[in-house]
Regions:
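Residue-level detector of Asp-centered blade-edge/turn motifs that repeat once per structural unit
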Residues: 23-24, 65-67, 105-107, 147-148, ...
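Conserved strand-to-loop turn within each blade of WD40 beta-propeller repeats
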Residues: 31-34, 73-76, 113-116, 155-158, ...
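Short loop/turn segments that connect beta-strands within beta-propeller blades
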Residues: 42-45, 83-87, 124-127, 165-169, ...
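Blade-level signature of beta-propeller repeat domains, shared across WD40, Kelch, NHL, RCC1
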Residues: 271-299
Length: 299
């Protein structure tokens, strides 16, 4: 496996916390502590377009494809709805005074993870809050939706994973998963596994069809693992960490294949916060507290 650094995108004035696809096939959005939401084109490196100013730090973005709207999580302020056609804010809803860590869509619902231990369920067409689900005493850091099983999972700073039914939002299972905060929960593309990471620097993989039994527990990094993502062809996955590194793993064996760091590949200088693996030339994108977004070719 060969790793090549393709580009570095600079433009943010502070830590970059999140990156999501813009669904063009060759672009993405980023946001972070400066409150800027920027659109980038992988075909035109480092020419970012400022599409929104949130006014507060942003941990979470989500693009709703059918309505062409982007949901922006304004920490302590609520949700902004951006029309991606003209880049104008169409609606706002002050759903919380807390931080917003994650936004996920399931059918016509938006699931929003908050810093006060609540998941807010909003109706997408009406942009109305439908319910509050109090899950934890501390922050809900991540949400993952499994369409195959009609479930969603949450990871929280109480060290737990909770599995809910998507229809009635009934709690199905609680797993004391990690020894510290859970930072990321992601279902594998086929829906068979749940990947969880956290402050304890462990990557854990759970078998969805075996009542979420543990498959493997890997001490994968030196410090907290912030995110996990999957390659478009489903053969690999990657993790990123507060230890400044990105690691690439084999999906079939869960074995480490490559480490991307500052010494080997001119990687990030501080915590790597989020990953996005694109279908554009199999490029892997990472963002960091160093204000930079790096693009990697994995071959």
């Amino acid at each position: 496996m060969n790793i090549r650094k393709v580009d570095t995108f600079s433009g943010h004035r502070d830590s970059v916390y999140t990156i999501i696809s813009d669904k063009t096939g060759h672009g993405f959005y980023s946001a972070g502590a400066d409150g800027f939401v920027i659109q980038w084109d992988l075909q035109k490196p480092d020419l970012g377009k400022l599409v929104a100013r949130a006014g507060t730090s942003v941990y979470a973005l989500a693009l709703h494809e059918s309505s062409q709207s982007m949901w922006i999580g304004q920490n302590f302020e609520g949700i902004q709805l951006l029309n991606t056609q003209d880049n104008k804010i169409e609606k706002t809803s002050k759903i919380t005074n807390s931080t917003i860590f994650d936004i996920r869509f399931a059918a016509d619902k938006a699931l929003i993870a908050l810093g006060d231990g609540v998941v807010v369920v909003m109706d997408i067409p009406s942009f109305a809050v439908q319910r509050h689900i109090k899950i934890a005493g501390k922050s809900i850091r991540s949400i993952a939706v499994n369409i195959e099983t009609n479930e969603f999972a949450t990871g929280d700073s109480d060290c737990n994973i909770h599995i809910f039914d998507l229809d009635g939002f009934k709690l199905k299972k609680t797993i004391q998963a990690h020894t510290n905060s859970v930072f990321s929960v992601k279902y594998s593309p086929d829906g068979k596994y749940l990947f969880t990471t956290g402050r304890d620097a462990h990557l854990k993989i759970w078998d969805v069809n075996d009542a979420y039994g543990i498959v493997v527990d890997i001490p994968a990094h030196m410090y907290a693992i912030n995110d996990v993502t999957f390659s478009p062809d489903r053969s690999l996955f990657a993790t990123c960490s507060m230890d400044k590194s990105i690691k690439v793993w084999d999906m079939s064996t869960f074995k480490l294949k490559k480490i991307i760091d500052r010494a080997r590949h001119a990687g990030h200088g501080t915590s790597v916060n989020k990953l996005l693996w694109t279908g554009f030339e199999n490029q892997l994108i990472s963002c960091s507290d160093d204000r930079m977004i790096s693009v990697w070719e994995v071959a």
